[in-house]
Amino acid sequence: MKKLSILVPYYNEGEEVIRTLLDSIAIQQNIDFNDIEVIICKDGDEGPELTQEFLDSYPYEIQYHREPKGGVSRMRNKAFEYSQGEYVMWCDDDDQFYHCLALWLIFRETNTPMQVQINGVTQTVNGFDVLKSVFLEEGRNPETGETYFIDRKDGFQFVHGSVYKRKLIVDNDIHFFDDCYIHEDNVLFAEASACTTQIKWCPQPFYLWKWRDNSVCRRSPTYIKETYTDLIKSTDRLIEWFKAKSKFDKARECVVRIVYDCYYNVMCHPTWEEIGTKEYRKKAEKRFSDFYKKYKDLWLECPDQVKMQIGNGIRQMVVQMGMLQEKVTLDDFLNRMENLK
């Protein structure tokens, strides 16, 4: 068995784009390349193929699988099925590892101890079920084109810079949802964290979320507004997963989080009133209305203390952005959503 499987969905980006990721693996130091494998799943027939000559030029095992068109989530799931590593991580083909000791750092953390709560008792365990890290995000100033970098310390919704133990994934049927193509990766850590307390935090970044002009989530300044319905969709799938696992507390928390997010970030956010985004708001409210009607019972069942904690956290983030504009109460908003046709 390999120590680590690096799982990469590939669409039509070409060798010049994916080369940066594969090169960043090839320069890794203090590791045995026999301990790793890279699994690339090509999503459909569109775009250039990766040649065998190109793949063979790297000093580690690369598997290249051509799959019927299915979207990024299905490719990530298929790559996992092909993999054999004790640990796995998903990388985008246009990203890269940040430095030459990234994999050494990951391997080191698989053996170092940490204290966790198991059945209410503090115990010391070696390794981890999940490793989450700070990762770097590369950005561009829209006016000057200047490059800047952000430390993503709160990016738990992203799959970037995360490593998972295979046994955890398999034993708990943790997976991406095939029909989710946008905001699809926010479900994985939510599923995993509901199944284990052996989660380790790495404050040292080893992954770089690179800027690419053609990236689907970078090319539009109104991306979140355009895709808010997809965020609700992926959360809907996650709630059903929690319910199937009898993790009803987690399901309730998911409902509460979307209720407050939609209230503060859609209803109370002044930019959603702009002429260019009114249509997005209309679609978001209709999708949320359906969501709320479906899960109203879970909202009502959730303890007020939990609601307050989640709501205050989301409200504080909006306040810090200077975008809070509470024109209606939460109750009035929910009543309108319940009656929306």
Region roles according to the model:
Residues 1-233, 341:
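Nucleotide-sugar donor-binding/catalytic module of glycosyltransferases
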Residues 34, 55, 108, 243, ...:
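Compositionally biased, low-structure terminal segments
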Residues 64, 114, 125, 271-341:
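Membrane-interface aromatic/basic loop that binds lipid-linked glycans or pyrophosphate carriers
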Residues 250-258:
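Residues within HEAT/ARM-like alpha-solenoid scaffolds
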